[in-house]
Amino acid sequence: MSIVSNTGPLIALAKVNQLRLLEVLYQQVHLPPAVHRELLAKTGVEAERLDQALATFIRVADPLELTPEVQAATLSLGAGEREAVALAHHMRLLLVMDDQLGRQAAQGLDLEVTGTASVLILAKQKGLIESVRKLLELMREHGYWLSDELITTAAELAGEE
């Protein structure tokens, strides 16, 4: 199974050195060019982790011409979100995105959407990680914005206290 990802989930997982979860769970991740450009702008250890993933299981797609339907649904989004929605729509793949407006646009196009927390819940169900809460809290400590409510809900869904 392959997926399309937006920038946010990749950065969040890179922050806690868990990009491998995407490879184990989904085998291949597809990125639109705008997301690739956003990832190339990262520096430090995150950039090194992202570079390793780009060299192995992440594929950068060719630019797509947006259909009128996708254009209309994604008018208020940034380039990365817009292109990620368009690529998921074109390839008919699951979209991994945390941005709320982007998720709404994708759902309006009848796309299946998941987020970083759901990826971690699935990873825990498959025995790949021990704690969803700990990883989400670590992401937040490293500057990835996550609400208390999201962390609590995800931990509960993962069967954690």
Predicted regions span which residues?
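Hydrophobic alpha-helical interaction segments
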Residues: 115-158
